[in-house]
């Protein structure tokens, strides 16, 4: 594979890139005039370029002049970024779009070579000038020390985080958008010693392998009582403020998981929540045999862990003054699996809403039917659907289904998709069978992102994608449109 190596520092202003090219002097001529409209032949240049694998300190000895690349997408396929954290520790980040690798390395020789290149650059020696004011400011003013040069280039990115957003060419005309985000913790990094761990992350429809020092994971675990790590961008969110931000990542806007109590607090007016059937719990109806933890013991452990009796909370409350019947599933309780108790509680909620002529909201978050209860869990699909038929078709009442991540299995195949209005959260994972199950069963590859809310919305699977901060107002408007009014307004009219 042909590889290009760049050491790039991002400017805050206009995101210009200052790059040092690791090249062979035999394959590359002068690059003083490299610009957006005047690009050398990439294929000829790559013949003698050093590869990342099996490198030693001398592999960086051919770093050449610093220059400006204004249109990075037409210039590189593999990228190495030189960065420094808040403690002053330097390391490089290698990004290979073709092999889908994102690697963090602590080799300090790279910085030394680039530093020498900076001071020995032909631009400085020749005293030439450029039309680029930013380039002049950072490159020609020799009163700036090397450290000031680095700090000016990276600035706020290296104090707390790195955010690189660019388009990169991979060996042809196909462009691949890459969004790379990495938190820099306040702990000092060691020199690439110790074990290495692989982490899979989802980046704009692609899976990249992040190879990171195990020390970073230790730091995350050490401060997990203070911070919540985003599962999408791996950014850290201060736990104390996360609840007030509705569990939405401050860095990338990803909707993190919420438990059922938090969702009730988000949507229902304070002081109006009246729970139903709180004491109903499963008694292991088929005496499910398990070689590991018995089913009843597992139920007990989840009850202690979550403070709930089952994987759903049901009750009556008010949404902006409008009385509603609400059921909220909790994925933290056995993956939100639907057993006999979950099905019974939801059925009773629907029957109560039918009797009292209330609008109905069910928030879905489930892995599907609970296997420990066998066919009893499967029959809940038909039981709930039957109750909904009477509610919707006979009584002509209004049911809103809200699909959160993940919503799969029997819930998707029953009441999850029976709403008069079906709303999904952004980036929600919605499917009947999971990706792994499909691939192992059918021996075929499931396209990346084909089970995401945005893709399914384009296919017409549901009606709306609504962020959490707008959900309550959207629900309120929907209910008013269907002639459900707040209690105080109803009393005034009568």
From Swiss-Prot:
Set out the biological process GO terms recorded for this chain's protein.
fatty acid biosynthetic process; malonyl-CoA biosynthetic process
Co-factor: note: Binds 1 zinc ion per subunit.
Give residue ranges for domain CoA carboxyltransferase N-terminal. Answer: 226-494
Outline what the protein does: Component of the acetyl coenzyme A carboxylase (ACC) complex. Biotin carboxylase (BC) catalyzes the carboxylation of biotin on its carrier protein (BCCP) and then the CO(2) group is transferred by the transcarboxylase to acetyl-CoA to form malonyl-CoA.
Tagged with keyword Plastid: yes
Protein name (database record)? Acetyl-coenzyme A carboxylase carboxyl transferase subunit beta, chloroplastic
Q: Where in the cell is it found?
A: Plastid, Chloroplast stroma
Family matches, as SUPFAM superfamilies: ClpP/crotonase
> Does the entry feature the keyword Lipid metabolism, yes or no?
yes
Q: Name one Pfam family in it.
A: Carboxyl_trans
Known cofactor(s): Zn(2+)
The pathway noted for it is: Lipid metabolism; malonyl-CoA biosynthesis; malonyl-CoA from acetyl-CoA: step 1/1
Cellular-component GO terms for this entry: acetyl-CoA carboxylase complex; chloroplast stroma
| Gene name of this polypeptide | accD
Q: Where are the zinc fingers (C4-type)?
A: 230-252
The record's keywords, sorted A to Z, are: ATP-binding, Chloroplast, Fatty acid biosynthesis, Fatty acid metabolism, Lipid biosynthesis, Lipid metabolism, Metal-binding, Nucleotide-binding, Plastid, Transferase, Zinc, Zinc-finger
């Amino acid at each position: 594979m042909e590889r290009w190596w760049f050491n790039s520092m991002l400017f805050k202003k206009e995101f210009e890139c200052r790059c040092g090219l690791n090249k062979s002097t035999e394959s590359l001529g002068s690059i003083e005039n490299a610009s957006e409209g005047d690009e050398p032949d990439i294929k000829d240049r790559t013949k003698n370029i050093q590869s990342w694998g099996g490198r030693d300190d001398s592999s960086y000895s051919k770093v050449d002049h610093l220059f400006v690349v204004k249109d990075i997408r037409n210039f590189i396929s593999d990228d190495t970024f030189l960065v420094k954290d808040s403690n002053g520790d330097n390391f490089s980040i290698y990004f290979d779009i073709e092999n889908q690798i994102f690697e963090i390395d602590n080799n300090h020789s790279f910085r030394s070579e680039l530093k020498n290149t900076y001071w020995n650059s032909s631009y400085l020696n020749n005293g030439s000038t450029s039309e680029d004011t930013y380039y002049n400011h950072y490159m020609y003013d020799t009163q700036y020390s090397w450290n000031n040069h680095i700090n000016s280039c990276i600035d706020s990115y290296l104090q707390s985080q790195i955010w690189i957003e660019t388009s990169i060419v991979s060996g042809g005309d196909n462009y691949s958008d890459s969004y790379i985000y990495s938190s820099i913790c306040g702990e000092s990094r060691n020199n690439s010693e110790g074990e290495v761990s692989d982490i899979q992350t989802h980046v704009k429809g692609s899976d990249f392998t992040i190879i990171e020092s195990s020390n970073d994971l230790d730091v995350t675990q050490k401060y997990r009582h203070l911070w919540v790590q985003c599962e999408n961008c791996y950014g850290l969110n201060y736990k104390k403020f996360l609840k007030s931000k509705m569990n939405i990542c401050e860095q990338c806007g990803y909707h993190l998981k919420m438990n059922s109590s938090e969702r009730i607090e988000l949507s229902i007016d304070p002081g109006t929540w009246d729970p139903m059937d709180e004491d109903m719990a499963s008694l292991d109806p088929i005496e499910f045999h398990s070689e590991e933890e018995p089913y009843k013991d597992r139920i007990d452990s989840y009850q202690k862990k979550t403070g709930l009796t089952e994987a759903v909370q049901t009750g009556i409350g008010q949404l902006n003054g409008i009385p509603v019947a609400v059921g909220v599933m909790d994925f933290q309780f056995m993956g939100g699996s639907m057993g006999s108790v979950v099905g019974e509680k939801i059925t009773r909620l629907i029957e109560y809403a039918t009797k009292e002529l209330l609008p109905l909201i069910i928030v879905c978050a489930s892995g599907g039917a609970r296997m420990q209860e066998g066919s009893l869990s499967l029959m809940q699909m038909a039981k709930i659907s039957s109750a909904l038929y009477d509610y919707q078709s006979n009584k002509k009442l209004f049911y809103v289904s809200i699909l959160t991540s993940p919503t799969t299995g029997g819930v998707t195949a029953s009441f999850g998709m029976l709403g008069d209005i079906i709303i999904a959260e952004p980036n929600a994972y919605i499917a009947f069978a999971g990706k792994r199950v499909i691939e192992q069963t059918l021996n075929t590859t499931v396209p990346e992102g084909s089970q995401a809310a945005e893709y399914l919305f384009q296919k017409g699977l549901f009606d709306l994608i609504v962020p959490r901060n707008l959900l309550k107002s959207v629900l309120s408007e929907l209910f008013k449109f269907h002639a459900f009014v707040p209690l105080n307004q109803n009393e005034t009219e009568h």
